[in-house]
Amino acid sequence: MKLLKLPSKLHDGQLTQCEVDDNKLYIIGGKYLSIWDSQTLLNAATGKTDVKEVKELEKMSLDLLESNQEDGRWLVVLDNQRLVYGSDHLLACLDLNKDSNSEYKSREIGIFKDNEAITDLKYDKVNGLLFVSLSKANSLQIMDSKTWELKSSIELKSKPISIITDPLGQLLTVILQNRSVQIYQYDSHGTTKLHQSINQFVQTNPLPYRMTMSPQGDVIPMINSLHNNVPTAVLLDRIQKFKIKLSLVGYVADCKILKFSPRIYSKTKSPTSNDTQTFNLLASSGNEDGNVVVWNTNRIKPLFDASKVVNSYITDLEWDNSGLGLFAISQDGQLVIFAFQENELGDVMPVEAVTEAAKEIKLLDPLPFKPKAEEPDTKLPPNKTAQQTTTNSKKQPKAAEITTISSTNMEFIQPSYMVPKDLKRKPVTEDPLLAQNKPANKKAKKELDQIDFLDTNLFLPSVSFSKVRLAHPKIRASFQYSSQGNFVLDIKNGLGNDQKPTSITLTRKDNESSKQLFQTFLPKFVTLCSAGSSFWAWSTDTGMIYVTSISGQMLFPPMLLGVPVSFLEGSGDYLLCITSIGQMYCWNVNTGKIAFPINDVYSLLNPMLRYSDDVLSRAENITMCAVTSQGIPIVTLSNGDGYMFDSAMEAWMLINDSWWPYGSQYWNFMSSAGVDLTSNDDEKKDKYWNAEADILAKEVKNNKNSIINYLETKTNDELTRKGRMKHLQRFAKVLLMKEGFENLEEMITLAHLENKILVSFRLKEVEEAIRLLKIYCIRIAEMGYTDRFSQTLSWLYDPTNTKFSPLDIDRRRNLIKDIIISCANIRQVQRVTTSYANELGVISDSL
């Protein structure tokens, strides 16, 4: 695939709609219309033509738009070199057949009032009809494209948003603002009949959707439904009474464009088989993200995804007639060309294949022709439940209701309000014309207000009310995970079904050979995997976790979490999992139990800083998630902070604060990746410098297995990446010179050391905690903090004190002796050290 973005902006940086007809690309935007040769654009994208030679065939100024001071929004290409364009209140026809010396002339078709706006414009080439939807009147007008005569008009219940025409010339799909979808049958005379109605199907949006049916006419696309709590687009099967044929999972929530390629594609199922499968391709784009996604109707996952093609949002997409090109226009005037190679999307079948596929669809019975003289003269009031056109007397089947997304909030399936036959109370008729034949002597009962109910089917409260949305991995074709140096778990994803399952293989690789330990298959997509000391685990895209031994034997039945997994980490006997809604699980695989009750990461994301009643907002990213061999979860954020979860307190605790690097003299035990943040030895020797404390600090620095050191390195990396490190170091120096902040550096240093000591004990890194405790005691003794020094020794001396519970009595006594000897020459604490030395016999032993 080749992508070309024209360097110059078109139409003064404003493009709204494009159409391809007879190898020509028509683009309207602003007050201009330009015509391009589509093959020349594709050749320029593939490198066959120099981009500098690419120019439009024609560019014309639309006089009617200039005179009415409006911008072009709508464009359809008719037969015989004619096209219809329009704005919000204007509709005009442009004849492209002209002499070489004459100019293009526009003919005005209709002008609408200021409060009457055109919401969509479509053309049916089979019957030569033009469909215009109007907002104020809530109507849809059907016009003859040759005489511009108004054939008929359909009165709608709500404002029409978008129109989808049928390539077979029989069905007209209208999307209304009340989230319902009306499907009408029509003919060349303009006669219409309501064919089917689907309630609460799409989200309400004032902007029109740009959608097309499949070229053979068997599928209608619908945007922004919900599938397993993931925004999707669904394809409705015309043959199966518009039931869902396929859901495109992983779809962007704000999509506004979904267009089918005009060709059908085929692909051989396997190299050894001659069987082929046919499929269609769809191109879609969101309203703000600037992405372009291509779908294969035989797959539920995207076939191709181009991110941030343009800086603004894409206003329209259009396929080339060859099926190998795709054009995209943006709101800021950019034209983007996607040129696909042959066989890249599949084998493009000839045009006749579309005709043959269309013949397999059973057409509807023709509508009875009703002359105008027989039509009723009385026009029904708008916005009523009665239809102006002919309706089917048979009861229509209830359409399937599909949950959709109207914003970033979660919505629920609304209950049905259809009245059963055995209910005597009937809804009050609003239209007096329909009630004129009914008895009026019976007093109508008061109409009760409708009650909204929550649907209990497929209802997960943790998802519906969760304010946390974490990203989860995309599905990869294959990936590997290494553990313990020589074990490699190889994941090869299939199609996610039993026809081609996912392969999972564990191999032990030595220097010269490799041995397969086990292999298994799953009819699902695998997204993450991890390993511990005696187990392997992997998760699927549906939130199911499998745990096996090294030999491949299942240790537990598959665990279903209900939502995708964002993090899956193992260490020792523990397996940590964080789901996409922020729930955290930690299991002890050896005992087969959960290590602590289920918790979440919601509190780490500073929810109160970005709190909103009904809007989800961005928070700090989780840059790392891990679990220690002792079963302690550790999380780092993009702001540099690191946290651990304490199972005894059942709360998250701060390991390192991004504030401490700016003032703590003991922060830079390890340098950031690629940036040395430490100073030289002379700068370290301040008035509180101590040789023994310096030696202990170097021992802590050289401990490569220290969890705290690693997390401090992560903090340094984040601060350096954001460019805040040098700036805040200068800021700290300026702050120290201000009145009232003279001891700021001392307080930050002590806070940092105290936290490191407490965290080391909770992480069960006892040796590192002892070294840090010695450094801390020497530091506070030199600073003259006698109370803190005395309290620390009293905690160590008291065997019932649980602050340093990992230390037994003998280690506590020996640690006190080491501290007393290290601080013996510090005059400020000699009274404290002497009392403890006498109690422990240090003085008598030395004498």
Swiss-Prot record:
UniProt-listed GO biological process terms: chromatin remodeling; DNA-templated transcription; regulation of DNA-templated transcription
Pfam families given in the database record: Hira (PF07569)
PROSITE patterns linked: WD_REPEATS_1
Biased composition (Polar residues): 384-394
Family: Belongs to the WD repeat HIR1 family.
Molecular functions (GO terms): nucleosome binding
SUPFAM superfamilies registered for this protein in UniProt: WD40 repeat-like
Protein name as catalogued: Protein HIR2
Function: Required for replication-independent chromatin assembly and for the periodic repression of histone gene transcription during the cell cycle.
Record PANTHER family: MEMBER OF THE HIR1 FAMILY OF WD-REPEAT PROTEINS, PROTEIN HIR2
Main location: nucleus
Gene3D superfamilies linked: YVTN repeat-like/Quinoprotein amine dehydrogenase (2.130.10.10)
Keyword Transcription part of the UniProt annotation: yes
WD repeats: 10-46, 113-153, 155-194, 259-305, 309-348, 508-548, 558-597
Annotated GO CC locations: chromatin; HIR complex; nucleus
Subcellular location: Nucleus
Region (Disordered): 368-399
Keyword terms, alphabetized: Chromatin regulator, Nucleus, Repeat, Repressor, Transcription, Transcription regulation, WD repeat
